[in-house]
Amino acid sequence: MNEKMESPWNPDVSDPRRLHNNYIRCLVTAYSGKFSELLSVLLASVKVRHFLGYALAARALVETTATLRYYVLHQYKPLLDKETLTIHEMKTLVEIDDRHLRGGRFDWDAFLSHRYEQLQSDAEAQLAASKSKQRHAAQGIITEQVNVLTCIEKWAKETPSVMVTYSLFCDLVHPNIGSSFLVASSDDSGLYFCPSKGQSVGESIFAQSLPFLVACTLKPFGDHLAMLMAAIWRDDEV
């Protein structure tokens, strides 16, 4: 990663173009760091034949790539394709940046400040709201994240195999038959739901699923990260 991209999050709200640039730099380094770490976890899991760990990292890689793609193509591109932006459009762009970087569904301020009672009361309020079919947002959430399934579905409309890949890895990490297969093995006596009896079922699933994962993540992630980097206004740089 180019060191020029490594910028502390210290937005200058008086200059919206520089504010946008600061957000983009932080997003690029965050995406790069997460993708690199997930790949490391995936490779380490395969090395020690922990195929459930492989599937967990794989699903996160798909979700990360899908979210990046969604923001680049469906949020930034319609605005940045314009020759000039109005004041209102510039404000919208910065709001997109903020949601992209700081969106979430967990009250990190309460957690990091050790206000666990607030987390508890928010959880209780959320449960009560769900019973009455209402919605409750925790007090400390700055802006809500985009739903990752929205990102997956937007992509899958153009590339249906993405939904196949995502459904596969979701099934491999949920507590059901998919994840049970990853710790299963078989020999001449039959199928065992333990990893130590003959041929590993998880290894077979890994070999069969890896091409799906590679097609859905490596090149798409690199392409869309480059597009995100290109969203920086160079003429505003010192």
What residue ranges belong to the model's regions?
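A cross-kingdom marker of C-terminal helix-rich interaction/assembly modules
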Residues: 1-238
